[in-house]
Amino acid sequence: MAKKAKVQKELKRQELVAQYAEKRKELKEKGDYVALAKLPRDSAPSRLTRRCRKTGRPRGVLRDFELSRIAFRELAHKGQIPGVKKASW
């Protein structure tokens, strides 16, 4: 389980990215890179990391489910993810 502070920090980054998205787009179209550099660092979308919705784990996150591989496996074995079943061939 990730520290609560790390998860909160990531949520704050997501809010900043959403807040400054339009302004960033306008500045990029103008080519005003000086003004773009003066925006908050955390407002850049490249600073976002994908985290597990259940545990907050930053590594091994499956994009389609937004769960870490560990949380995905647990829920899949319990049958709590619709449409997912154990493969056999």
UniProtKB/Swiss-Prot annotation:
Record-linked Gene3D superfamilies: 30s Ribosomal Protein S14, Chain N
Pfam families to which the protein is assigned, alphabetical: Ribosomal_S14
Domain of life: Bacteria
Keyword line: Ribonucleoprotein, Ribosomal protein, RNA-binding, rRNA-binding
TM stretches of this protein: none
Family: Belongs to the universal ribosomal protein uS14 family.
Record function comment: Binds 16S rRNA, required for the assembly of 30S particles and may also be responsible for determining the conformation of the 16S rRNA at the A site.
UniProt protein name: Small ribosomal subunit protein uS14
